[in-house]
Amino acid sequence: MIITTTEQVPGYRVKEILGVVSGNVVMSKHLGRDIAAAFKTLAGGEIKGYTEMLTEARNIALERMMKEAEKLGADAVIGFRYSSSTIMSGAAEILAYGTAVKLEKI
């Protein structure tokens, strides 16, 4: 499966647009991470616990989006993007989305 942020895939043309596909996940902070983060913000620098949590969330959202595209029989997802939002205090949603398409080699 090809995933690209562009609207075209070099060497291919879009044969059919199958529709918008998405995958999301809501992750919450962990109390231990919050305590460590509070100390880290005083000293400055990367908060590795949150970085790891967001990386995991992006990977889960991407995987879910790809599964949705595969169910439609897509060869690729074009116009791929991530979005994030705060759902409630201490919880964030990561959304992966794009357009599922069938490709034809040119």
Curated annotation (Swiss-Prot):
InterPro entries in UniProt: UPF0145_dom_sf, UPF0145_YbjQ-like
Matches recorded under SUPFAM superfamilies: YbjQ-like
Gene3D superfamilies, per the entry: Hypothetical protein apc22750. Chain B
Membership in a protein family: Belongs to the UPF0145 family.
Stored HAMAP family: UPF0145
Protein name: UPF0145 protein TM_0763
